[in-house]
A protein has these predicted regions:
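Bacterial Sec-dependent N-terminal signal peptides
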Residues: 1-26
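Early extracytoplasmic/domain-onset interaction patches
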Residues: 22-60, 140-145
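Intrinsic-disorder/low-complexity, polar/charged segments enriched in Ser/Thr/Lys/Arg/Asp/Glu/Gln
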Residues: 24-26, 38-42, 52-54, 105-107, ...
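Juxtacatalytic substrate-recognition/specificity segment
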Residues: 43, 207-334
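Non-catalytic architectural context of zinc metalloproteases
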Residues: 67-76, 80-255, 271-274
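A generic secondary-structure signal for well-formed alpha-helical elements
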Residues: 116, 168, 249, 253, ...
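Post-HExxH zinc-binding segment in Zn-dependent metallohydrolases
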Residues: 275, 282, 315-316, 327-378
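C-terminal recognition in membrane/secretory proteostasis and scaffolding
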Residues: 346-347, 355-620
């Protein structure tokens, strides 16, 4: 680190005035002793020289862009002196505890409940950033859900000891310091809290594969509760994507170790899934009900996105991320970079490597255009949305994967226009990584000017209009430059699967009914659904609060043009009598408004050359 000797000297000189001695946190957790679905966390504290100390579990963590309040899952918080005598503790808020007579503090302990199945705790933690405690089966330890820090002491070293059940393995990017491989204790050491919070762990009976990609060792670890999927199969899907990304990044990777930690859920009521990125790992929460084909596609696309985060925010990040505040975070303006450009690169790398062809790539971009303009505020400033994503614009966050990726695409095409195809966003990312890097943050308000300095004056206008401002992206002009015609008012044919009816719970019950048919599609009308119909089954599968997600997923995945769809409903035929009725209709093709992207039949030589450069073929 630059000027390291001066920083060390400064730390020694100021240690006394800060009120804390420079030592380490020593945490321990015993996975063999859960109680009531909770684990006990014990911390032997670093010496404290202040009268009071405030201990935090995070309110927000990097990459989630949502308030999670991990302290809500901690209970029975206690503090002790060296003789084991209790010290007074006051809970300040959901995530903070104030300890009195802190100069005497020696140990704290508390119990942690998991986020995945604790409905009585009214928080909403997305599963990839959550925790799971299942005795003798599996433990998911997102570190920030178990381990905290004293206010002002985030940069002290951490030592975490985990006692594991016999035969369990801890999948993580961290290196186990305990060389006794036959023992049941793992010991992990990190430089500070940020490094610990950035490293999830999953403990279970192992199904793992190690891959070698360029200079990096890659761990793939899968938990499939019903053994439907094996790690070797997912690793085979992931490796070509990683090879493509290595080539996309210039032939080497900015890491030497990485872990894909994958949990396949067998929950029948699963309505959401996804992943959370970390600097040297990513954690996945995916449905075990996926077909092999769907899982293969999903893992390629999601892994491609998450793995690209090794570049940003690992090597390119603002001060807001480099020195993240877990309690009162200041959001960066640049979600277009962290998530949008990452999403763009994930698909662009697959195109350049030949993993997907141009028609497939363009289909994905059409979906992003349609989703951005129909599901989100397409005129909202992206920088404003980013800064206020925790509250005012939290519902707009998914647009980072839609319009954010389109911003990345547009920037790439604009750079290639200006450079004659010789310079694009992957070159820009390499230049930004060289300018900043893992230990040097950029100032949030200066990034656009720095990018302009590295590229072309016209790029400042691009950011001003389309990222800071709300002007529509110039997709027509940019696609035209590579010989592709964009029609925002196009149409496409598709199998109509939507019913266009509203679902709701029948009053006083947990039974699902048809609430309204005002916006019924042609399919919904042909089925003959009526308001107040109680849905018994769809396609002969029981339709309940527990099964509705898997039933609809099965329908969406497996039913094709010409197949017959059925609803079994209970319909009132009189005030006190209901009759079970089976309704059927066949799936038909419909023409719907949709943006289209079509390669020109006769592009100019200049357009063709620029397209080849963009797709990864050298300019002739």
């Amino acid at each position: 680190m630059k000027q390291a000797k001066y920083l060390i000297l400064l730390a020694l000189l100021t240690a006394g005035s800060s009120g804390f001695a420079q030592k380490e946190y020593q945490f321990s957790v015993d996975l063999t002793q859960p109680q009531d679905d909770k684990l006990t966390v014990t911390l032997d504290t670093p010496p404290i020289r202040q009268k009071t100390a405030v201990y935090h579990l995070p309110k927000v963590v990097p990459g989630t862009y949502s308030i999670n309040n991990y302290g809500s899952y901690a209970s029975n918080f206690k503090a002790f002196d060296k003789k084991g005598r209790a010290l007074n503790v006051d809970k300040l808020d959901k995530n903070s505890w104030k300890i009195s007579k802190a100069k005497k503090l020696s140990r704290i302990s508390y119990q942690v409940d998991d986020t995945w199945d604790t409905p009585e705790i009214k928080e909403d933690v997305f599963e990839p950033s959550g925790t799971d405690i299942e005795q003798d089966r599996i433990f998911v330890l997102n570190s920030f859900g178990f381990f905290g820090y004293f206010q002002g002491l985030e940069k002290l070293p951490y030592r975490v000891s985990i006692t594991k059940p016999q035969g369990f393995y801890g999948s993580t990017s961290l290196v186990n310091q305990n060389k006794d491989t036959a023992g049941n204790k793992d010991v992990f050491v990190t430089d500070d809290y940020h490094a610990l919070a950035d490293a999830p762990l999953m403990y279970n009976r192992p199904d793992t594969v190690w891959l070698k990609v360029g200079n990096a060792d890659i761990l793939v670890s899968v938990f499939s509760p019903n053994n439907k999927f094996a790690t070797k199969d997912l690793a085979a899907d992931i490796k070509p994507t990683l090879e493509a990304q290595k080539d996309y990044l210039g032939g080497t990777l900015p890491i030497d170790k990485y872990a894909f930690i994958i949990y396949m859920s067998d929950r029948q009521d699963l309505t959401r899934y996804g992943a959370l990125e970390h600097a040297q790992s990513s954690f996945y929460y995916l449905p075990e009900s996926f077909s092999e084909e769907q899982l293969s596609k999903s893992i390629k696309d999601i892994a491609a996105h998450e793995f690209f985060h090794i570049l940003t925010p690992l090597s390119i990040h603002s001060e807001e991320i480099g020195d993240f505040d877990y309690i009162n975070p200041k959001m960066s303006r640049h979600l277009w970079l962290y998530e949008g450009l990452t999403e763009y690169a994930a698909h662009h790398a697959q195109l350049q490597a030949g993993i997907i062809d141009l028609p497939t790539y363009l289909d994905r971009q059409m979906d992003k255009i349609e989703n951005s303009r129909t599901r989100h505020n397409d005129t909202l400033s992206f920088t404003t949305m980013s800064q206020e994503v925790l509250d005012t614009y939290k519902d707009e966050y998914p647009n980072v994967y839609e319009k954010g990726a389109l911003i990345g695409l547009s920037l790439d095409l604009k750079l290639r226009q200006l450079s004659g195809g010789k310079y694009g966003t992957k070159d820009l990312m390499r230049d930004l990584a060289k300018t900043y890097g893992k230990h040097k943050s950029f100032k949030d308000d200066e990034l656009f000017d720095k990018i302009t300095e590295l590229t072309y004056p016209e790029i400042r206008d691009f950011f001003r209009k389309y990222v800071e401002g709300g002007e529509p992206l110039p997709l027509g002009e940019l696609f035209d430059a590579i010989g592709i015609t964009y029609d925002p008012n196009g149409e496409k044919k598709e199998v109509e699967k939507a019913f266009g009816v509203g679902f709701a719970l029948m009053p006083g019950t947990k039974n699902i009914m048809i609430a309204s048919i005002n916006e019924a599609t042609d399919l919904g009308k042909r089925l003959g659904l009526e308001p107040m119909d109680q849905i018994v089954a769809i396609n002969d599968q029981p339709f309940t609060m527990e099964t509705y997600a898997s039933v609809l997923q099965n329908y969406d995945e497996k039913f094709k043009l010409g197949d017959t769809v059925s609803f079994t409903v209970k319909r009132k035929v009189s005030a006190d009598e209901s009759k079970e009725v089976k309704l059927t209709a066949d799936l038909r093709e419909a023409t719907v408004p949709y943006p289209t992207l079509t390669p020109k039949a006769n592009p100019t030589q200049q357009e063709l050359q620029l397209r080849k450069a963009w797709m990864g073929t050298a300019v002739q």
